[in-house]
UniProtKB/Swiss-Prot annotation:
UniProt feature coiled coil, ranges: none
Domain of life: Viruses
Other noteworthy facts: Expressed late in infection.
The family this protein is said to belong to: Belongs to the baculoviridae p24 family.
Keyword S-adenosyl-L-methionine attached: no
Cellular component aspect of the GO annotation: viral capsid
Keyword Transmembrane among UniProt keywords: no
Pfam families on file: Baculo_p24 (PF05073)
InterPro entries: Baculo_p24
Annotated localization: Virion
Gene behind the chain: P24
The protein's name: Capsid protein p24
Species the sequence originates in: Orgyia pseudotsugata multicapsid polyhedrosis virus (OpMNPV)
Keywords: Capsid protein, Late protein, Virion
Length: 192
């Protein structure tokens, strides 16, 4: 049984809306047992596991921890729910990356990389810039290509289609960034 001084309850944050309660038990230097609160584990594993209700009942007794009337699941208990996930599936759901981070952090006994909202916005801006650059290259290549005689309508339709497609992508990305900026503003206001 772990020493009471070695039990460390904390919260790991991975996104503006993904904060998980964890318990880290330090057995020895560089030897940690990480436990994730059961409801957080259920939310996190929902895209990968259809029967989340069995999460606690099917866990090995050594993977269960009850503290302050809350149930916690050991990091090793999370692995079996990923065994049927197709890692070749693209694109991965956002939870895929969060699960990987949670598992690494629970094994290490500390959160390795905290969520940085500004970094998230920068990443989204870079993705928008790449998308716009692709659109510009495509439009430029079509503009410089000589249209076949009698095909100006086809070229016009192509340009209109490309314009519509990239306008939708830009609108979606802009809305996402605005939502994140609003979340950051809310977080800053809460911290004051």
């Amino acid at each position: 049984m772990a020493n009471a001084d070695s039990l460390d309850a904390r919260a790991f944050s991975y996104a503006p809306d993904a904060s998980f309660e964890v318990i880290i038990i330090t057995n020895a230097p560089n030897d940690h047992d990480g436990y994730l609160e059961l409801n957080a584990a259920a939310r996190l594993l929902a895209p990968f596991q259809k029967n989340i209700s069995a999460l606690w009942t099917s866990a090995a007794p050594s993977h269960k921890l009850v503290r302050n009337n809350k149930n916690y699941l050991h990091v090793f208990g999370l692995f079996k729910y990923l065994q049927n996930y197709n890692f070749n599936a693209k694109p991965h759901p956002p939870e895929y990356y969060t699960v990987k981070s949670v598992i690494c952090d629970l094994i290490a006994g500390a959160q390795g990389k905290t969520f940085d909202p500004l970094c998230e916005i920068k990443t989204q801006l870079c993705a928008i810039q790449e998308s716009l650059n692709e659109a510009i290259v495509t439009l430029n290549s079509h503009a410089t290509a000589e249209p076949a005689p009698g095909a100006p309508c086809d070229a016009r339709e192509l340009v209109e289609t490309l314009h519509s497609e990239y306008s939708q992508k830009l609108t979606f990305a802009t809305d996402t960034i605005l939502d994140n900026v609003k979340s950051i503003k809310d977080l800053v206001c809460l911290n004051k």
